[in-house]
Swiss-Prot record:
EC code: 6.3.4.5
InterPro entries: Arg_succ_synth_type2_subfam, Arginosuc_syn_C, Arginosuc_syn_N, Arginosuc_synth, Arginosuc_synth_CS, Arginosuc_synth_type_1_subfam, AS_cat/multimer_dom_body, AS_multimer_C_tail
The protein's assembly and partners: Homotetramer.
Biological process, per Gene Ontology: argininosuccinate metabolic process; L-arginine biosynthetic process; urea cycle
Organism of this sequence: Salmonella agona (strain SL483)
Amino-acid biosynthesis recorded as keyword: yes
UniProt GO molecular function: argininosuccinate synthase activity; ATP binding; protein homodimerization activity
Family per record: Belongs to the argininosuccinate synthase family. Type 2 subfamily.
Keywords: Amino-acid biosynthesis, Arginine biosynthesis, ATP-binding, Cytoplasm, Ligase, Nucleotide-binding
Top-level lineage group: Bacteria
Residues annotated to bind L-citrulline: 99, 135, 139, 192, 201, 203, 280
Descriptive protein name: Argininosuccinate synthase
Residues annotated for ATP binding in this entry: 17-25, 43, 129, 131, 136, 194
Amino acid sequence: MTTILKHLPAGQRIGIAFSGGLDTSAALLWMRQKGAVPYAYTANLGQPDEDDYDAIPRRAMEYGAENARLIDCRKQLVAEGIAAIQCGAFHNTTGGLTYFNTTPLGRAVTGTMLVAAMKEDGVNIWGDGSTYKGNDIERFYRYGLLTNAELQIYKPWLDTDFIDELGGRHEMSEFMIACGFDYKMSVEKAYSTDSNMLGATHEAKDLEFLNSSVKIVNPIMGVKFWDESVKIPAEEVTVRFEQGHPVALNGKTFSDDVEMMLEANRIGGRHGLGMSDQIENRIIEAKSRGIYEAPGMALLHIAYERLLTGIHNEDTIEQYHSHGRQLGKLLYQGRWFDSQALMLRDGLQRWVASQITGEVTLELRRGNDYSILNTVSDNLTYKAERLTMEKGESVFSPDDRIGQLTMRNLDITDTREKLFGYAKAGLLTASSATGLPQVENLENKGK
C-alpha cells in the first residue's frame, strides 16, 4: 500500500487537521469540489490567539466537511509539557536562553489524538497544512503512522493539481470569494506565528533575515519587555513542586494542570519571561531561525532546575543534562514516543523528578531578568554548615583534607608524566602560549 498519495483520492474520506485559517479552509473546500469526502478535525491546544474554538467546526461544515469535530487536547498537551520539564528535554539554547520545544510537544499531541479520532470515524487518510521544507511534515507522518498503521497521507501542498490552481494565499482568497464565501485575507504580518498553550513560535518572512530582531515581534503571550515605555513592575512569585510535579503558584494549589499552566503563563507573561531568539537545525539539517515565547514553561523550568541542583549530586545532574539534551533532540525530530525516548524519559522521571519536592521564590523583572530569592526543600543535600567559612563544629577536619590532598598526588604524578610524553612527541612545548613553563624541566624531560 502506498503511504503518501500525490493526488486527491476522489470519493474517499480524508481527514484534515483544520485550523479555520485561509489555507485549510481553501483546501477543504477544494477537496470537496474535486470529489473527496473531507472530515475536519480541530485540536483545542489552548492557543492564546484563538478566541472561539466552537466556531471552527461550524466553518468547516459550511465549507463542505462531511463532519467536523473539536478535539480537546489541552490536558494531554500540559502533561507532555510537564514531562519535558521533568526530563529537561530541551536541546536548543543560545546564550543560556532555552527553546522549550513547545511546537514539537504540540505536534506529538495533535498527531496522535487527531489520528485516533479519525480512526474512530473510519477515516484512514490524513491531510494537514505542513510544507515539504519544514519539520512538521515528518513529525505528523511519524505520529500518524504510530497511531494508525493503515494510515495514508494526502497533503494538498504536495499535490501539483492543488498548487497549480491555488498556489498562493491570494489565489486561495479569490477562490473562497468566487465560491460565495466572504473570506478576506487577514492583514499580512512580517512573520508567521504558530502557538499552543505551552508557547508560541514566530518565524519566516522578515524573521528569515538575521538583521530583523525580536523588536518586530508583537508577543501574544507576554509583553514587549525591550520597549522602555512598557511599564513592568518587579514581582515575587513562588513555585512549589511535589515529586517533580508543579502543584502551587504563589501559595495557590491547583488540582487541574491546565489551569496551573494558564496561571504560570499569566505570571511569566507579565514580564516577557521565556522569550528567546534561536538558530536551530531542522530535521533535514538545514538551519532555520525562530523567536519563541514560553512564559509558563520558563517559570516552571527555572524553579525545577533550582531544586534539582540543590537535591541531586553532581553526576546525577550531569546525566540529567546529557540525557535531557538527547531526549530534546528526539522530541524535536518527532520521536517523543519512540523506544529510545521512552527509555530516557523513564529514567529521568523515576530517579530524578521523583525527588524534586520543595518551593522556590523568585523575583521577576523584565524579560529573562530574574533573581532567586529563596529555596526550601526537605530533600536538599545542600547543607550550609558543611562548608561554612565561620568557626565552629565541622563535618571534617584540616587533617582530613590533608589526607585527601595527599591522595591526589597519584593522579598529579600521572598527569605530569603524560605532559612529558606529549612534549617528547612534539605535541607540547614549554612556551607561554601553552601555559606550561611552570612545569619544571619539561623541555629536558621531553628530549
